[in-house]
From Swiss-Prot:
One GO cellular component term: HslUV protease complex
Key words of the record: ATP-binding, Chaperone, Metal-binding, Nucleotide-binding, Zinc
Span of the signal peptide: none
Name of this protein: ATP-dependent Clp protease ATP-binding subunit ClpX
PROSITE patterns: CLPX_ZB (PS51902)
Function text: ATP-dependent specificity component of the Clp protease. It directs the protease to specific substrates. Can perform chaperone functions in the absence of ClpP.
Species for this entry: Shewanella sediminis (strain HAW-EB3)
Assembly behavior: Component of the ClpX-ClpP complex. Forms a hexameric ring that, in the presence of ATP, binds to fourteen ClpP subunits assembled into a disk-like structure with a central cavity, resembling the structure of eukaryotic proteasomes.
All residue ranges annotated as the ClpX-type ZB domain in the record: 4-57
Residue sites binding Zn(2+) per the record: C16, C19, C38, C41
SUPFAM superfamilies: Glucocorticoid receptor-like (DNA-binding domain), P-loop containing nucleoside triphosphate hydrolases
Binding annotation for ATP: P121, T122, G123, S124, G125, K126, T127, L128
């Protein structure tokens, strides 16, 4: 290899065998047996190969569509519990990508979209389920918050911005974006304020539902290209949203009361009323499992919007046992992540069983579900993570129940096998 000349050719002017440029016109000239190639031609070849790989990859992805069992098995590695929701999601996602693989009407039958509605409390795993599937399928994934969306022409975020975000995730590759997954969170927050159609404009509730209808069902959205505002003369990108899988999720607080009103067999008041004791009351999770589309209409979603989300999955509230599992069992469990961080310092991190129970209890008290676990663990480990890089000869850090409760500091075990509480000196 040489910059401007090759070994054995010191007095001879060399040229690129591909483009014909001399060694003085290029930065690098790579020598082979009686052949030379310049850095510009190498870069050009790389670009051509990249473009060809980009064209081939969607087809390869389609050929390797995992079965519902394989999708479910992958979800089990990262998400604890929620067995029914996993099964529903796996089948819906499989059917969606099978529809894309076999595009066009099948024997005159046009297959509809299998968009999904996830109902479950905060921190039950709605976002994680969608994100994990997208990562496994190697498709672009983006999230949107329904509470920030408004109808076009009003202050706020237009629904078309969701597609713009998806394009950004795949470097504005339209073909890739059209195979992506969009998760819209807090969908329950855009329910209309009453059952009856209002004469006033509801730009953040029913208005957003109307705006999302076409996008979710399938339309060709015109999205400005990268840096579109700086280059207004560029043509808009046309994205077919009928190929994009939309997953909507929400806590739907109070929905259980709507379901109970529908399913109640008692008269409710008077001498003939059916009175139920505390022991007869079903849990909120059990009640939500009985949800029907009519309940969602009563809650405030318009019938047309519910019709665009035919797949319904309910997630149960996580109990203490599930939270303890989430802390330690998944492949990317929080305790494993922090153990890896400590390992980078050459220190072993151990969470005792009573510590995991205490962390789960804290999360239940805060009513944050699995979402709050990380912030709790961060708080517990903050001081030791601050001091550890400056402390020598620490071999192991142990976290027990008293550390979680703030009654003591983490136990440090040194390389000479002596142990003491952090900061005890």
């Amino acid at each position: 290899m040489g910059d401007n000349k090759s070994n054995g050719d010191s007095g001879k002017l060399l040229y690129c065998s591909f483009c014909g440029k001399s060694q003085h016109e290029v930065r690098k000239l790579i020598a082979g047996p009686s052949v030379y190639v310049c850095d510009e031609c190498v870069e050009l070849c790389n670009d051509i190969i990249r473009e060809e790989i980009k064209e081939i990859s969607p087809k390869q992805d389609q050929d390797k569509l995992p079965t519902p069992r394989e999708l479910r098995a992958h979800l089990d590695d990262y998400v604890i519990g929620q067995d029914k929701a996993k099964k529903v999601l796996s089948v819906a996602v499989y059917n969606h990508y099978k529809r894309l693989k076999n595009a066009g009407p099948k024997d005159g039958v046009e297959l509809g979209k299998s968009n999904i509605l996830l109902i479950g409390p905060t921190g039950s795993g709605k976002t994680l389920l969608a994100e994990t599937l997208a990562r496994f399928l190697n498709v672009p994934f983006t999230m949107a918050d329904a509470t920030t969306l408004t109808e076009a022409g009003y202050v706020g975020e237009d629904v078309e911005n969701i597609i713009q975000k998806l394009l950004q995730k795949c470097d504005y590759d339209v073909e890739k974006a059209q195979r992506g997954i969009v998760y819209i969170d807090e969908i329950d927050k855009i329910s209309r304020k009453s059952d009856n159609p209002s004469i006033t404009r509801d730009v953040s509730g029913e208005g957003v539902q109307q705006a999302l209808l076409k996008l979710i069902e399938g339309t060709v959205a015109a999205v400005p290209p990268q840096g579109g505002r700086k280059h207004p003369q560029q043509e808009f990108l046309q994205v077919d949203t009928s190929k994009i899988l939309f997953v909507c999720g929400g806590a739907f607080s109070g929905l259980e009361k709507v379901i109970e009103q529908r399913s109640h067999t008692g008269t409710g008041i008077g001498f003939g009323a059916e009175v139920k004791g505390e022991d007869d009351k079903a849990s909120i999770s059990d009640i939500l499992m009985q949800v029907e589309p009519e309940d969602l209409v009563k809650y405030g979603l318009i019938p047309e919007f519910i019709g665009r989300l035919p797949v319904l999955a309910t997630l149960a509230e996580l109990d203490d046992a599930a939270l303890i599992q989430i802390l330690s069992e998944p492949k990317n469990a929080i305790t494993k992540q922090f153990a890896a961080l400590f390992d980078m310092e050459g220190v072993e991190l151990e969470f005792r069983e009573d510590a995991l129970k205490a962390i789960a209890l804290k999360a239940q008290t805060r009513k944050t579900g699995a979402r709050g676990l990380r912030s709790i663990v961060e708080g517990i480990l903050l001081d030791i993570m601050y001091d550890l890089p400056s402390t020598e000869n620490v071999a192991k850090v142990v976290i027990d129940e008293s550390v979680v409760k703030g009654e003591s500091t983490p136990i440090l075990i040194y390389e000479n096998s002596e142990s003491q509480a952090a900061g005890a000196e």
